[in-house]
């Protein structure tokens, strides 16, 4: 194997490893939890769309905690 081809192979492996590490770090998130009690609904670390918001509002809780948009 030529020196240039060998160097290209090493660079390819390094770049692939870096991409794998970065993508694994980006996908590591907290689990989505929705806790519903008689008095409140707590939403944590969830991607919420308009249909989910309407469904939660239809439950008519006394309070809706930790609701955030991402």
UniProtKB/Swiss-Prot annotation:
Enumerate the subcellular locations listed in this protein's record, separating them with semicolons.
Host endoplasmic reticulum membrane
InterPro entries with a match to the protein in the record: TGBp3
**Membrane-spanning residues:** 5-27
One GO cellular component term noted in the UniProt record for this chain: membrane
Positions on the Cytoplasmic side per record topology: 28-70
Q: Which residues lie on this side of the membrane: Lumenal?
A: 1-4
Q: Could you tell me the superkingdom of the organism this chain comes from?
A: Viruses
Looking up Pfam families in the UniProt record yields: TGBp3
Q: Which GO terms describe its biological process?
A: transport of virus in host, cell to cell
- Tell me more from the record: TGBp1, TGBp2 and TGBp3 seem to act together for cell-to-cell propagation. TGBp1 is the main movement protein that physically cross the plasmodesma with the viral genome. TGBp2 and TGBp3 would facilitate TGBp1 function.
Q: Tell me the function of this protein.
A: Plays a role in viral cell-to-cell propagation, by facilitating genome transport to neighboring plant cells through plasmosdesmata. May induce the formation of granular vesicles derived from the Endoplasmic reticulum, which align on actin filaments.
Q: Which family does it belong to?
A: Belongs to the Tymovirales TGBp3 protein family.
Protein name (Swiss-Prot/TrEMBL): Movement protein TGBp3
